[in-house]
């Protein structure tokens, strides 16, 4: 049930957060606190509901640009920027964990990071997580962006960036918008080509994660590397 604007202005979600913790609030209520006020004919909690519905939940909101958010009627630049900043902070918490932890020992963390980075994308993107000798994240970089069904990946560019960042290993990830997370024959062939190119400069390809919405698949776990 959504709250009337006067009750929201009185701080009901805020008071509950202070007394019982943020975990007691629903997703729309948490968004309402970031938005602070609603728009014409829609209080802040209702606006939170609308955002989640329009973008397919928190996963869909993650990584949404201010311009995309402003498509929502009444959502101006200020609200869109605040919301985009909050969502980007959420994404960066996963990146911070990868900087501190061994990626090989934390496959679930890697999959969650890749899903957060790619699960909401409408066209194919490929990213590379460049890792140091302790398998901690140095940097995550986009290496390809394509269409709904494909992204052109150049192994030489991935190798060049690995050398530039002094990486000892890396993890690739790409998304299948609107499809399944299963590796295609082309995915397998390209992955093996990249692995061979990296091996020439003593850089190890640890995994290639495929993302389709909320689903992720490890090509290493499936024996495709």
UniProtKB/Swiss-Prot annotation:
It holds the Pfam family UPF0758_N. One of its GO terms (biological process) is proteolysis. InterPro entries: MPN (IPR037518), RadC_JAB (IPR025657), RuvA_2-like (IPR010994), UPF0758 (IPR001405), UPF0758_N (IPR046778). The keyword Hydrolase applies. The keyword Hydrolase applies. A motif (JAMM motif) lies at residues 174-187. GO terms for molecular function: metal ion binding; metallopeptidase activity. CDD domains: MPN_DUF2466. Residues 103-225 form the MPN domain. It comes from the Bacteria. Zn(2+) binds at residues 174, 176, 187. Keywords: Hydrolase, Metal-binding, Metalloprotease, Protease, Zinc. Belongs to the UPF0758 family. This is UPF0758 protein BPP1850.
